[in-house]
């Protein structure tokens, strides 16, 4: 599919500023009682709101993401990235910053919606662990909020251009006027694809379908679903994870696909996450109809002991494995245990099965960021599915510093290099920060995404909860300075002055909140009688 954002009055894609004014003029001529409504105001407001619904956003961003996936298949240097956002304002500022620092472009830069952050920050129950205990409706609500703020970023940036255009016309600067109209015509939206975490579906396949619909209607083009038991779900980096048989998970994949197709988002993307590497338990024994089928393969990983009819106990669950009676190890929790050391094999089987049943991207949850560990599994998957590719969690749950310093330490030691100056267990200590080992580790961290995109098939690199940590860090720094000896200078020097020096748009916070947009709307609606907020006495004038 190929979906483009709407122009002002057409469904056929973006149109020029002038043609949209002309379209509005033609409409207004048919309505003689619409006094005081100007064609240019209508054109501007429509341009500022080029996505009318969440489904418009989902279709547009799905097409972008599909194009990015095809580009990556041809060139693995063209991987994509995202940062997890827990509030619309955070997403808005992220995209404004991206456009500022990267030539006005947002190419291959996405949003990520983390179930962990919704649980920790957005539940009405207060902070919760990542165990699917938060309200399921909070997920589509946050998606809608993220895109509301991104659409407002479009409106704000275009409004500033419109004001500059009016100024150029007033001054008779035709060259500047032409330049600004071209800028309007070439405007790139802040709206980008989102990969949204649906956890394990919050229930059965029907519950998954219903929630998927709400998420897509809110704007999600990509849904990430995991193979854990919904009511026993754990964070991917915690213990106690329990997986479900493949037929259960496949039903939820199909539920997501049906939701996309029902809503006309044919390009919708499904990301299937396997937690099998760290999950040693299953709630169910899979149904198997014949030897070697998917249920039999799942059950082959169960930790069993051979028994006979004579030593079987009352209440035992017994399976037939290659003609032998086997008793799976069952815990007091009524969960069944997998054989130790089978995690990678189960991840490979999970991934192949998901791709063969409608998944578009894989997600293998690992316990550490190690390229070769990921690559070895992907190599096995690609023997069956040659274009298999991953989304990968560059997780804050990893201690990146100690992991990579230990990787370098181990590599140096294996190569016969002298590591006597280093204590492997203490490499996190600050005294190692300026050492050659730390420098090499930092370089490996810097190139991790590019290296793993090339070696391990990672199409999308995300950080799940970076803005959770940046909020905590920046608040800690401000509290230390402001409530300490620095007083007000702690804010002025380290926040406001830095915003101004770095050109952070929020330095003019009234403008960011929509005050100028509101003033211009007042003028559209009331003409010269409009009472505006942005007059000579507005303190925002101090910021230029």
List the model feature ranges, each with a label:
Residues 401, 469-470:
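A SIS-like phosphosugar-recognition module
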Residues 463-468:
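Short acidic/histidine-rich active-site segments
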Residues 1-2:
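Non-Sec secretion/translocation targeting segments of pathogen effectors
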Residues 372, 472-473:
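Extracytoplasmic/secreted cell-surface and envelope-processing proteins
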Residues 11-456, 462, 526-544:
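Alpha/beta enzyme core
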Residues 474, 478-494:
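Long, continuous compositionally biased terminal/linker segments
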Residues 493-544:
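C-terminal functional modules
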């Amino acid at each position: 599919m190929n979906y483009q954002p709407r122009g002002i009055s057409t469904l056929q894609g973006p149109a020029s500023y002038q043609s949209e004014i002309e379209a509005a003029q033609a409409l207004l001529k048919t309505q003689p009682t619409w006094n005081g409504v100007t064609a240019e105001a209508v054109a501007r407001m429509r341009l500022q709101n080029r996505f009318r619904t969440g489904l418009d956003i989902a279709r547009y961003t799905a097409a972008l993401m599909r194009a990015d996936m095809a580009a990556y298949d041809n060139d693995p240097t063209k991987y994509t990235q995202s940062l997890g956002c827990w509030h619309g304002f955070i997403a808005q500022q992220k995209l404004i910053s991206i456009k500022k620092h990267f030539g006005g472009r947002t190419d291959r830069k996405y949003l990520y919606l983390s179930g962990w952050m919704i649980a920790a920050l957005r539940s009405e129950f207060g902070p919760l662990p990542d165990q699917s205990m938060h309200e399921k409706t909070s997920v589509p609500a946050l998606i809608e909020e993220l895109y509301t703020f991104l659409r407002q970023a479009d409106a704000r940036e275009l409004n500033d251009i419109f004001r500059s255009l009016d100024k150029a016309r007033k001054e008779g600067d035709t060259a500047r006027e032409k330049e600004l109209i071209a800028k309007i015509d070439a405007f790139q939206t802040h709206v980008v694809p989102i990969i949204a975490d649906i956890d394990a579906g919050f229930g059965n396949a029907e519950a998954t379908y219903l929630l998927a619909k709400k998420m897509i209607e809110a704007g999600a083009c990509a849904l990430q679903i995991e193979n854990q038991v919904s009511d026993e779900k754990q964070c991917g980096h915690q213990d106690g994870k329990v997986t479900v048989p493949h037929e259960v998970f496949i039903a939820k994949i199909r539920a997501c696909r049906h939701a996309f197709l029902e809503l006309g988002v044919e390009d919708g993307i499904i990301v299937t996450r396997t937690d099998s590497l760290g999950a040693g338990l299953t709630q169910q024994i899979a149904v198997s109809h014949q030897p070697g089928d998917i249920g039999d393969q799942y059950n082959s990983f169960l930790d069993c002991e051979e028994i006979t009819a004579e030593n079987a106990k009352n209440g035992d669950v017994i399976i037939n494995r290659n003609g032998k009676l086997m008793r799976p190890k069952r815990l007091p929790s009524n969960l069944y245990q997998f054989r130790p050391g089978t995690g990678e094999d189960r991840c490979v089987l999970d991934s192949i099965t998901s791709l063969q049943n409608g998944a578009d991207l894989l997600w293998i949850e690992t316990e550490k960021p190690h390229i070769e560990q990921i690559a070895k599994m992907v190599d096995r998957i690609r023997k069956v599915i040659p274009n298999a590719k991953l989304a990968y969690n560059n997780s804050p749950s990893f201690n990146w510093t100690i992991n990579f310093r230990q990787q370098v330490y181990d590599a140096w030691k294996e190569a016969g290099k002298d590591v006597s100056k280093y204590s492997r267990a203490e490499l996190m200590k600050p005294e190692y920060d300026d050492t050659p080992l730390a420098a090499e580790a930092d370089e490996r961290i810097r190139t991790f995404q590019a290296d793993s995109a090339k070696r391990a098939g990672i199409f999308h690199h995300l950080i799940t909860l970076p803005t959770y940590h940046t909020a905590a860090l920046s608040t800690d720094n401000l509290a230390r300075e402001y409530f300490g000896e620095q007083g007000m200078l702690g804010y002025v020097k380290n926040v406001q002055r830095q915003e101004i020096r770095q050109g952070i748009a929020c330095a003019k916070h009234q403008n960011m909140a929509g005050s100028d947009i509101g003033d211009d709307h007042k003028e559209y609606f009331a003409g010269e009688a409009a009472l505006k907020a942005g007059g000579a006495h507005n303190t925002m004038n101090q910021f230029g």
